[in-house]
C-alpha cells in the first residue's frame, strides 16, 4: 500500500544500561497497561516495513511478545548511547529510511512517520528529522536517511556522541507536535515511572467523576 513516503524501517533503541531503573529493561515494562514493546509495535506496525530492536539482551522475550521482531546489538561493546545504535542499524536494515524511537517514550503521535518524512522534505540537504513535543526536542525519536551514516561514523570516531550536535551537521528538520497534560514524554527512572502511573491513575479517577 502506498503510504505517501518511501519504505521505512523502525528501530527501537533499547541498548542502554538502565542504571536509574536498577537495571530493569524499560522495553519490557508496562507504562500504560501493555509492555512498551507491544505498545510501540501496535502503534507503528502499519506505518513501517520491518521492526527491529537495538538491544544487548532479552531477545527471546522480545520474540515471544512479537514473533517477527528482529534484533541487533551495537557494533562496539560498551554503552555509547543512541548515536551508536543508529550507526549500527545501517549494517542490518534494508530500507534507506529508518524511524528511531526510544524504548521509554510515553506518547507516540498519530501520523508521526508521515510527518517526519514531510519535515525531511523541507530541506534537500537534510538527512534527519526529529520529533518535538510541547517544545521539547526528542532527538532520539527521529527519522534518518541512509546517507547520514558517514556523519554518524565521523562523530563516533571523534567521540562526539551528542545527538544535538550531530543533527546540526545533518541539517536536521523538526516535526512539531502538541499534547495536553503530558507530564512525562519519556521515563528515565523508577521514580518517574511511579509518578507517571500515579498521575495516570488520578486522571482516570477524575475523569469518571
From Swiss-Prot:
Chief location: cytoplasm
Binding-site list for GTP: 13-15, 26, 54, 74, 104
Localisation per UniProt entry: Cytoplasm
Function: Transfers a GMP moiety from GTP to Mo-molybdopterin (Mo-MPT) cofactor (Moco or molybdenum cofactor) to form Mo-molybdopterin guanine dinucleotide (Mo-MGD) cofactor.
GO molecular function: GTP binding; metal ion binding; molybdenum cofactor guanylyltransferase activity
SUPFAM superfamilies linked to this entry: Nucleotide-diphospho-sugar transferases
Alphabetical list of InterPro entries matching this protein: MobA-like_NTP_Trfase, Molybde_CF_guanTrfase, Nucleotide-diphossugar_trans
EC category: transferase
Cofactor: Mg(2+)
Free-text domain note: The N-terminal domain determines nucleotide recognition and specific binding, while the C-terminal domain determines the specific binding to the target protein.
Name by which UniProt lists this protein: Molybdenum cofactor guanylyltransferase
Assembly information from the UniProt record: Monomer.
Catalytic reaction list: Mo-molybdopterin + GTP + H(+) = Mo-molybdopterin guanine dinucleotide + diphosphate
Keywords: Cytoplasm, GTP-binding, Magnesium, Metal-binding, Molybdenum cofactor biosynthesis, Nucleotide-binding, Transferase
GO term, biological process aspect, one: bis(molybdopterin guanine dinucleotide)molybdenum biosynthetic process
